[in-house]
Amino acid sequence: ERQFTDDQLKLLIERGAVIGGVFDAWMVVPGWERGKTLPKEAGVKLEHVVDHIDHVCQLAGNTRHSGIGTDLDGGYGLEQTPSDMDTIADLQRLPGLFRARGYTDDDIADIMHGNFIRFLREAWA
């Protein structure tokens, strides 16, 4: 399951949206029970976040509509983040995970920050 259906994602893509991949486990794996399920026992890893971002890229046919939407601003802690993520510094591992799937350095830069910057520049122009 995903937070958005494919039909919803396609509509967002058609409107030029940038969709941020989230790290809150309930949005990453099915069957998550807040306060009961733990990331390690559920097997939640950064790779799952990359799966979701890759899915958006596949639906769009490019990387222009995907970004990192971490939500790591204090709304939750390690009890709901991927088990292989200890600090925000672990976000630096994402480019390697994308590279292993064949993404180019330009595509990775767009996903990591470029798409949101482009989107905001266009919105504010």
Q: What kind of feature is each model-predicted range?
A:
Residues 1, 31-32, 78-79:
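Short, well-ordered secondary-structure micro-motifs
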Residues 1-17, 47-64:
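Histidine/acidic residue-rich metal-binding segments in metalloenzymes
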Residues 12, 20-47, 57-59, 73, ...:
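Alpha-helical transmembrane segments and their immediate juxtamembrane cytosolic regions
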Residues 21-23, 60-85:
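Short acidic/histidine-rich active-site segments
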Residues 39-46, 75-85, 98-107:
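Outer-membrane beta-barrel pore domains
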Residues 41-58, 80-93, 121-125:
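Short, electropositive alpha-helical surface patch
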Residues 86-125:
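Mid-to-C-terminal alpha-helical segments outside catalytic/metal-binding sites
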